[in-house]
Amino acid sequence: DAKGQLMPELTASDAKALVPVSLPPVAEPEPLDDPRRGDVDEWGRSERMRSLARTLYAPLYEKWFRVEWEHMDRTPADGGALLVANHAAALPSDAPAIMHGIEVEMGRPVYGLADHFFRSVPVVGTLWARNGGVVAQPDNAYRLLREQGQLALVFPEGTKGPAKTYDERYRLRRFGRGGFVEIAMRAGVPIIPIAVVGAEESMPTLARVPAVAKALGIPYFPITANMLAFG
C-alpha cells in the first residue's frame, strides 16, 4: 500500500541552525502577466481543471494506490507552509497523491514546485500549470508562501529521486543545497516534512537508458516492471 506519513513540523526558527542566520535580502519577484479570464489564476491554476482531475484521479488514489495518511492535521489549515517530501517511482505518483489528499481532506489548494522542463513540454506543460504546477524558482516560492499564504509542495531530490532503480529504493538523494530551508525562513513559514512510503513499489525502475533520455531531451528514461508486465 502507498502510505504518506506526515512527520513533526520544522519551523523557521528551528531551521536557523541549518543555514546562516544572516541572509541576503529577497529579490523582488518579476511581475507576472495579468490573470487570464475565467478561473485561471496568475500561476495558471484552474480550479475547474483541478476539480475534474480530482474526480478522475479518485479511483486511482483510493483503489489502486490505496493511499493512507498519518498526521495530516499537522498541515496548517490556513497560511503559508512549505511541504517537503521524498520523491520516487519511475512516473512519480507521490506528487498527485499528496496534492489530491490535502485538497480533498482539507479543502486547501496545493501548488507543486517542479523543474522548468514540465512547463516547456507542449500540452503537458499547460495541463501541469492548470493543475497547480509552478516553476521551482525562489521568487515564485517566496510569493506563494509569504505574499499569498499558499501551500507549496517541493521535492528537493528533484529528478534524481524518481530516476533511482529499484535496488536503490528508499535511499534519499542529495537535497540540492538546502535552498528550500532558506526560502521558508525568508517567508516566515513552517516546513512540513512528508515521508512517502510505498511509491517505490508502485512503478519500480529496473534500469535506465541514458541514450534514449538524451535523444528525447528528458531527464531520464526508465525501463519499468510495469512496461514488461503490459508490454
State each model region's role.
Residues 127, 143-144, 182-186:
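Hydrophobic/aromatic ligand-binding patch that stacks against planar heteroaromatic rings
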Residues 125, 164-168:
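Short acidic, glycine/proline-rich loop/turn micro-motifs
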Residues 4-101, 105-139, 209, 227, ...:
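Membrane-anchoring hydrophobic helices of lipid-metabolizing enzymes
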Residues 79-85, 113-115, 149-156, 189, 194:
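Generic beta-sheet signal
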